[in-house]
């Protein structure tokens, strides 16, 4: 029944959901850009793990729903509980889970790391992996922006705002373990080297 519904939807929209094999072929090997942000007193950020940015990591051909491509890649690598939306225009962070953002369409200027962090422009095909505690906020309206978010299996979603970065929040962040897979490249992905647990 679901396959029939899928075929009808694909016929109506002209775009489809890729198979796991098709999605794998759309992954582009990229060197990560790393950004380690310090606690600024309001946004805790992560003391051990840097934000990892893969530029143009996913090819998004017209034949497939771009968000479905990214969902398939993240899901195949064990990152789930996904959503489709934009990026909030207020500064926030998560204390009990890491998060990955895949840009399915459009572009946006995003402040990462709190008010003393960095403003980065993210575009279609980019993937950003945010360690627990990393502040993030879209700072300007974004035309056509569609983001796919997902989380590793361990962890719990929460959404404190700056000023709520208590000592308890910092303790929670410090205890979120490194994920076992890179959301784009799997077990051997660059994230695994970038996020070697430096707490030991």
Residue ranges and their predicted role:
Residues 139-200:
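Double-stranded beta-helix
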Residues 116-118, 144:
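Short, surface-exposed beta-strand-loop junctions and turns on beta-sheet-rich folds
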Residues 58, 104-105, 114-116, 134:
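Short, flexible loop/turn elements at secondary-structure junctions
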Residues 86-100, 115-116, 123:
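A short beta-loop-beta micro-motif enriched in histidine and acidic residues
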Residues 3-91, 192-200:
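A short, N-terminal "cap"/entry segment at the start of jelly-roll beta-barrel domains
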Residues 122-142, 151:
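Conserved metal-binding segment of the jelly-roll/cupin
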Residues 110-111, 118-120, 137-138:
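Short, solvent-exposed loop/turn segments at secondary-structure junctions
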Residues 94-111, 129:
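Short, conserved beta-strand element in jelly-roll/cupin
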């Amino acid at each position: 029944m679901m396959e029939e519904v899928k075929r009808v939807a694909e016929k109506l929209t002209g775009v489809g959901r890729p198979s796991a094999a098709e999605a794998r072929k759309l992954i582009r090997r990229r060197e990560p850009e790393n950004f380690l942000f310090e606690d600024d007193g309001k946004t805790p950020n992560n003391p051990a793990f840097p934000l990892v940015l893969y530029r143009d990591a996913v090819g998004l051909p017209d034949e497939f729903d771009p968000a479905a491509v990214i969902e398939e890649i993240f899901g195949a690598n064990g990152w789930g509980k996904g959503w489709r939306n934009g990026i909030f225009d207020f500064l926030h962070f998560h204390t009990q889970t890491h998060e990955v953002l895949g840009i399915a369409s459009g572009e946006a200027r995003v402040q990462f790391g709190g008010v003393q962090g960095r403003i980065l422009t993210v575009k279609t095909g980019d993937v950003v992996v945010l360690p627990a505690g990393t502040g993030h906020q879209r700072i300007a309206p974004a035309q056509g922006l569609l983001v796919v978010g997902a989380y590793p299996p361990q962890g719990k979603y929460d959404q404190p705002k700056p000023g709520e970065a208590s000592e308890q929040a910092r303790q929670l962040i410090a205890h979120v373990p490194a994920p076992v897979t890179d959301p784009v490249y799997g077990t051997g992905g660059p994230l695994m080297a970038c996020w070697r647990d430096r707490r030991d």
